[in-house]
Amino acid sequence: SWTSGLLKYKSIPFVKLISELKEKYQVDIIIRNKRLTNPALVVSGTFSEDQSIGDILKVISNSLPFQWKKTDDTYIIK
């Protein structure tokens, strides 16, 4: 959750993180890679609310096997 300008999360499902990012940044994020929707797939990390959603996705994609692209106002995770 967002506290003092930071998004801190520990072992939360990737899909929950994406849901939080969608709400925080008011953007549409579509997960096309069905393996990433598995609730057992968890992520941990801390981000500043000053970071763009693109920066956050870039960092997460370094530790999880996915690629993403932005089309108009929609982020697509492949």
Residue ranges with predicted function:
Residues 1-78:
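A residue-level detector for the "anchor" residue at the start of short, highly conserved motifs
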